[in-house]
Amino acid sequence: MKLTYSLFDPTGNRTILVQTPVPEAEQPRIAAKLMELEPETEQVGFYQETDPIRLRMAGGEFCGNATMSAAVLSAEHANAEALDAVISVSGAADPVPASVKKQPEGYWIGTVEMPKPKAVTEVLLPGAGAVPVVQFDGIAHVILEQPLPRPLAERSAPAWCEKLGADAVGLLFLDKRTGGLTPLVYVPAAGTLCWEKSCASGTTAVGYYLAREQGEPVTATLRQPGGVLKIAADPDGHLMLTGAVRQLETKTIDI
């Protein structure tokens, strides 16, 4: 089959959005093949320009960076310099509002009204002790203020995902002093375990956790391996994520 897809760079979190319709059962296989062809890619989503726009990640998880990228793709299709969109995204119970605006340098600034987490709990996890877990519909994020050796973190992610009963899990290594955040994301349905350059839902989880911890609204700028994401959060779950997106190229291949 011929497949058309676009490559995006949202804060280093290299993302493929497939524009050709693909049956849901085939999406993990197609995603795995595309990630072989584009080895710097960290995730794959399947895009439909309907009303609202639909975005399904290969593992059925939620992804804020891919949501922002989908808004950029829709703006490019409309030949628009700015766009306010509502996007139906896997792993989110309700459609997600997103806005993007093109910058003179060619990249886009985007904001996404992130879904409110279902819960924040403290969970006893092997190798980490009692740690906060921020649970979204499509992913659970574990906030870790103490480092773990990378091999241990990579072994722990699948076990913790199973223990939490989550569709996907993020291990968020947070340095409160510097604002540094290093995310490791495991998505079993897609068969991926990735040290991501940035993680939008992980950034949101940290913002919400800090707002609840401090009992007041916070604005956090989190420095990640691929760049900076900004989250404005309050304890009631109003969560606005801001980041940058570059559209790299669009390809059509036989697969």
Where are these regions (language model features)?
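A glycine-rich beta-to-alpha transition motif near the start of alpha/beta enzyme domains, typified by
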Residues: 1-108, 142-255
